[in-house]
Amino acid sequence: MYTIPKKTINTLDDFTLSNLELILSKDCNMACSYCFLYGDTNSGEEFIRWDDLLEMLKNINISDKLTIGLNSGELFTKERLPLVMKAMRVLKRITRYKDTTIDWRLYSNGTNFEVIRDFLIATQGERRTISISYDGEDSYRKLKGNQPSTTLDTLKRLSESGFANDIIIRYAITEKVYNMKETFDALYKLGYKNMEYYFIRNYNSYTVPLVVATFRNSLSDTLKYVKDTDIDLYNLHDYYNKQDPTVICNYGNMLVVTSDGKISTCCAVYEGIYADNVEADLLDYDRIPEIYNNFETSYIYDRSKSECAVCTNQMCKECCSYKAIGRDKYYNKRHLQQCHIRHAELAVYDSIFN
């Protein structure tokens, strides 16, 4: 059975950064349970250690193409936009010291058209993409106070302003997956072509046979529809290009920087819980080999011992990647939630594209 290839990182020179995730703050404006990954989403804590971050980046190897993801509960509010712009200004300085090109990835719930538009206008010379989460009009996503989301209105106005190609739409798989084709069709008619769907990392409904059956039928309808359009469905790249299951994070060349100035290997592992053996202060960046080796020893999932065959499925990233730090053994069997739904997914792709 396929397992994650391990990398040897004995010294700092063995490490080359190609993906950086910076958590700017923890403020979420949505009420759904799956909107944000990092536990406390209303701490108000902002990242302020810019000089220390630059010091680290100057002193480690960086790939000639660096992807920087900026994260928060919601980046695009009037209060947060100055912090986003500052992050981009400061981090661009690294190109003075390193021969690298920066691709920016930013994430949003799409609830403030004016702020997103202003950002896109101000950064037209940058290589940047905004991922906006939208699951259809009957989505579980609500604004706090159980108010309906304004995302669709934002998407309409962004498209009318000429920014559809700067945006990736991310659709979460829930019990309401029956609306996927209709949602993709509505977005396509608005001018959006960059789309993907994703599985929620911890979601018990994936074990329900009716949900799996609904997903299978809806995915089949959606893929047949996509096949006859010029929609760029990112999941299809995984089907065509991957021979083995991959992982959520780029193991061995990624760092996450938290809002309180800690560095670690992968933001997807945490979910609000941190562990001293796989994190270090920004100024202790010489410990990167140590935290990677600890991560490899303690948290990489051993797929060879898995009773869930989904670990051999090339479409799978979330399953069988890493154990969640600080969680019990039952929580860390989350990959079992996806055993059936992931194989249903692959079977649908094979039936249409193989």
PLM-predicted stretches and their roles:
Residues 41, 53-71, 78-201:
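Radical SAM/AdoMet-radical enzyme domain recognition
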Residues 27, 31, 35-38, 252, ...:
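Cys/His-rich metal-chelating microdomains
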Residues 33, 76-77:
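Aromatic-lined carbohydrate-binding surfaces of glycoside hydrolases
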Residues 11-50:
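Canonical Radical SAM [4Fe-4S] cluster-binding loop centered on the CxxxCxxC motif
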Residues 29, 75, 111-112, 137, ...:
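Short, solvent-exposed loop/turn segments at secondary-structure junctions
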Residues 1-3, 7, 262, 270-354:
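Flexible mid-to-C-terminal extensions adjoining Fe-S/redox cofactors in radical SAM and related proteins
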Residues 1-21, 62-64:
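N-terminal [4Fe-4S]-dependent radical SAM core
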Residues 194, 203-271:
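A C-terminal junction/extension of Radical SAM enzymes
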